[in-house]
């Protein structure tokens, strides 16, 4: 799914339901489920899934102005539907370093990163699905539902 409705957004919130549906992945295989792109198709927001020691795990990340990534910790999810929400915010001005990324799974905040120097970043397009770096050992079908995005307010389940 591609969402072209964002328009150089300094803040972007997205919520959707995700079910791994027993997708086959080799241990430590990972790929990206969501990318948020700027106006020239550089990814600046991402959500990654991996399979580790028999568990599915998710982590979110925001790109800074030096092209580095601020990653959340990996959070284990069960093989069932989950409600996922992300709140990405660009820094307010150059030098403020007050950009942030918050991440919820099933209504519980699992990560919050702040102090990100990303004042030059803006969200222009979102892709949701198996968007990048799918390993050869990954096979099957997972499910997404009820995607919603906003500029500011919490969306919830």
Name each model-derived stretch.
Residues 2-14, 26-27, 73-82, 138, ...:
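Extracellular/lumenal carbohydrate-interaction signature centered on repeated Trp-anchored short motifs
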Residues 11-19, 81-89, 102-104, 143-150:
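Residues within well-ordered beta-strands of beta-sheet-rich folds
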Residues 113-145:
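Flexible glycan-contacting loops in extracellular carbohydrate-active proteins
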Residues 1-62, 149-156:
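Secretory/extracellular carbohydrate-interaction modules
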Residues 41-45, 67-73, 108-114:
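Surface-exposed loop/edge segments in extracytoplasmic proteins
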Residues 96-104, 134-146, 154-156:
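Extracellular carbohydrate recognition
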Residues 60-83, 92:
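Short, aromatic/His-centered strand-loop micro-motif at the edge of beta-sheets
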Residues 83-115:
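Carbohydrate-binding surfaces in secreted/extracellular proteins
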């Amino acid at each position: 799914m591609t969402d072209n409705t964002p328009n150089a957004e300094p803040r972007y919130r997205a919520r959707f339901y995700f079910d791994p549906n027993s997708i086959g992945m080799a241990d430590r295989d990972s790929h990206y489920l969501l990318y948020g792109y700027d106006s020239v198709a550089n990814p600046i927001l991402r959500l990654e899934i991996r399979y580790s020691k028999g568990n599915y795990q998710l982590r979110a990340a925001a790109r800074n102005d030096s092209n580095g990534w601020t990653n959340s910790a990996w959070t284990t999810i069960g093989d069932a539907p989950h409600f996922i929400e992300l709140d990405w915010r660009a820094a307010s001005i150059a030098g403020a370093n007050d950009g942030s990324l918050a991440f919820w799974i099933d209504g519980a905040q699992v990560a919050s990163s702040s102090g990100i120097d990303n004042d030059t970043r803006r969200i222009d397009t979102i892709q949701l699905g198996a968007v990048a770096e799918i390993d050869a050992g990954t096979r099957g079908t997972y499910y997404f539902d009820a995607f919603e995005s906003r500029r500011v307010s919490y969306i919830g389940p």
